[in-house]
Amino acid sequence: SCLREGSDIDRIAEVIQNVPGRPLVVVSALWGMTDRLFRAAREPQYAGRLVNDLKSQHLLFAPGLDTGEFSELFKKVISGISNELVNLSSGEYSLRSENLILAAGERLSALAVAHRLRSIGLDANPIGAEDIGLKLKGKGRASEIDISASSEKLEREKLIGIPILTGWFGEGEDGDIAILSRGGSDHSAAAFANLMNASKLILWKDVDGIKRLNPRWGIETPAIDYLGYGQASELALHGTPVIHPATVSPLIEPGIPLEIRNIKNPTTDAPTVIGPDFDLDSIVAIGCQPGVSVITQEGPLNSDLLSR
């Protein structure tokens, strides 16, 4: 997440105020929040301290959230985290309880962003993705969003004003909450772009686009100015940490362009734009997939293994 401090929400406000047309905003949890929620779900003994820390951190981002227009929703989410942590601390693991705890990060983020935007006069409205019919493929944990089912069920009339939507989770095939893999808010944003016939999707990150080499390798390379959908998917699958691997799939059929922008430099041109595949022959980047091993078995040329 690029939501590290309150000033990042101010940058979001600046973007919204200057964007043409009607924006729809999809948020992830505040920076570091999902890791802490994962730990609390797996180690409930940290529950009491975590809940207090969550409340304090979000109030630093959005002062007055606990007394403002969304105060009841804020208290409900905080209380929900406490209740689910109590359930887990009883010793009986529940994927549903864990999912509800994890999804609270996005819910709190949407409330904090909406509250802060409202404080400067923007008509921002926090909305839970599963509350308006976003359907996921899977139960509990899902690989991707079901665009076809979501298109039929999505309650678009609830997207009023400037919607601040939760990323990363939705409604699973069993009607209960389901979450995507880590970084799935990118995919959520792309799905909403598809479902709302958006002219463009912008992913705001804390990096300058997708680089030719993974910056974690310690070699500085320039950003790739243009990537095809297929190229972007391949890089996401092979070690490029900027976007979720499923991000571009909802964008391909409608041909929606995707821009990767740096929230720290909102007025500069997009370092990387993703769109239709044009040039499939040139090498644009190098990626790798860690944790993969090759096993080679050697034997005489007349070995029976060769005929199997």
What are these regions (language model features)?
Residues L258:
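Binding-interface segments
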Residues L251:
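Acidic-aromatic/histidine active-site loop/patch
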Residues E130, R261-N265:
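Acidic carboxylate-rich catalytic motifs and surrounding loops in phosphoryl-/glycosyl-chemistry enzymes
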Residues P271-R308:
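A conserved regulatory-domain signal marking ACT and ACT-like small-molecule sensing domains
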Residues L134-A142, N265-S282:
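Self-splicing inteins and homing endonuclease
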Residues A40, R261, I274-G275:
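Short beta-strand-to-turn element immediately C-terminal to the catalytic PLP-Schiff-base lysine
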Residues S1-I243, V248:
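Nucleotide/pyrophosphate-binding catalytic subdomain
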